[in-house]
Amino acid sequence: MQRSRASSTSSGRHPAPPPIGLPQPQAQPLEAPKIIVIHPGSQHLRIGRAADLNPLTLLHAVAYRRRPGASDRPHHDPLLPPLDNVNSNSGLMVEFEEQRLVVSRILQHCVVDNKNRLRVATPPQQLAHFNRSSQAEKVPAPSGQMADEPWLDREAPVLFDDRILRLGAVDARNYDIHFPIQRGELNVHNEKGGSLQASMQHLERIWSYALEERLKIPLRKLGTHCAVLVVNDVYVRRHLREFVTLLLRRLGFRRCFLVQDSVASTFGAGIGYGCVVDIGAQKTSIACIEDGISQLDARVRLSYGGGDLDQVLLLLLRKCGFPYRECNVQESYVDAHLLDELKEKFCHLNASVCGAQEKHFNLRKHNGQWLRYTIQVGDEALMAPLALFHTELLNITGRTKAVFTQQAVQDQYDCEDCFDAEYLKETGRKNGVRGGDILQLSTSAGYQPRPQLPVTADDEELIVVDQDETISNCQSQLGAQTAGGQMNSNGCYHNGQGLVLPLDQAIIQSINRLSSYETKRKMFGSILLVGSSAKLPGLAAWLEQRISQQVQSEVNVLIKGMDAGMVAWKGAAIMSVLESARELWISQNDWQRHGLRVLRERSPFLW
């Protein structure tokens, strides 16, 4: 039912009527200025009206000022993935240097023009000689920075957006800094502010700031607005429930609906099908979309992204004498943001660019003085993004990178879902019809129960216990099968050494999990690159060449002319005003009366 309904929605055909018992969505005029599209990410939040040309992009973090004299340690969620015990004597650094040499030798065999001339690389020692002698020079403040404007409001109880990026190592000690989403999912942990409800509170503070201060929409008027939330393809059902509660009850939107980011990306790019590769700040997700449906078996989220490339770039720059020697991305948000900017300015995947390139960057010191640094960069600008294809370089941010595929329904226990498998097990009667129904379901799943004997009044308690054991054994077997399937599903995205697969091989593995040869061929011919870290020059051509060398199908890697990080947001804005999307909206009254049932029935993806 879900698949046919969602397919008809995406293709523009007349949508199927809602299930009996749920109210028909009211046919109200769609006003794009009254629709707020929200795309939350690990590092950035993109939010804006559906009628806007581009969304606002904010840092998706909040900093709470600590009480004076607080004895506990401040909590700092890092802007960049932390290094995994990296020092000059560690085995990780030895591995990193070995892999750097491997990548360097590969680049030496690249042809730079039609005359078959090979690249000539500048050794790091030569670059270090220049960079170590480079001195910073004083420069005036940027034109956008007023001379009398305070750099940091030290009295503000809460900081948002770029104010957090102005916190150096010393100033950051006065704040608890939280990123509510990390590695593509809610940042739930055992430290301060790490509970699920605390994470939702952080989201509420950030989104309220964006709505009131940046979009100039008073919170009391959100009852006249609607919201579209872009969520991950690999999702946790309980988290989606909390998101809807946040939008409808806590923020007070009139109605909302959810859409998966890869599906929204196909709408934003104007394609009907394709393999969507979303390279974000802290994760890379792959999903195959056909007729507006994200194929369940082909979804995967890999725990590496642009932030990991930042750390690789920093180690490479330090090897060639990085002139800003005090750079401390672990404690200073100023330095972490600087490194992210250097990746965007320096890095590329164009093998024809070789030799030393002179670059500049500006930095504000604690005393308010702006400095200009000059640095020479060679193949370091090319090696850092190549870590997407040589994941051994990414071991510096954790040797074991998590891989997430969509969990089965029975693995996502939710006590508020009346159709949850565990809920049905615990609330079903121990004898009579329901016990037999559960056994019948178990039989259809492949379990053969023992023959039933006639039940007498004296034997009822005995049979009840026997049924409990039978059901428990059956579900244990099914749970083991599900866990094994989940493990096998994740294991196919690791190589023989247990390392997560490179980007090109992960895409091939994801597409090959599809059952139809024709569908596979279509996906290889339409690979869409999106995400904030997919804007590296030359990435699409490099990825296309790598995949073409490993498959026989025609390979086309697409990247649209717009900002790759905004494609999903634009697609969600387009979906929100479509006539066929009317049945997707969930109102406050629907959510209050029906809860998860209405989300299950109206979500445009398989629940």
UniProtKB/Swiss-Prot annotation:
* Sorted UniProt keywords: ATP-binding, Cytoplasm, Cytoskeleton, DNA damage, DNA recombination, DNA repair, Nucleotide-binding, Nucleus, Phosphoprotein, Transcription, Transcription regulation
User: Source species, please?
Assistant: Drosophila melanogaster (Fruit fly)
Q: What is this protein called?
A: Actin-related protein 8
A GO BP entry is: DNA recombination
GO MF annotations in UniProt:
ATP binding
Please classify the protein's predominant subcellular localization into one broad category: nucleus
Name of encoding gene: Arp8
Which Pfam families does the protein's record reference? Actin
**Phosphothreonine: residues bearing it:** 9
Chain intervals for the UniProt region annotation (Disordered): 1-27
Subcellular location as annotated: Nucleus; Cytoplasm, Cytoskeleton
CDD domains in UniProt: ASKHA_NBD_Arp8-like
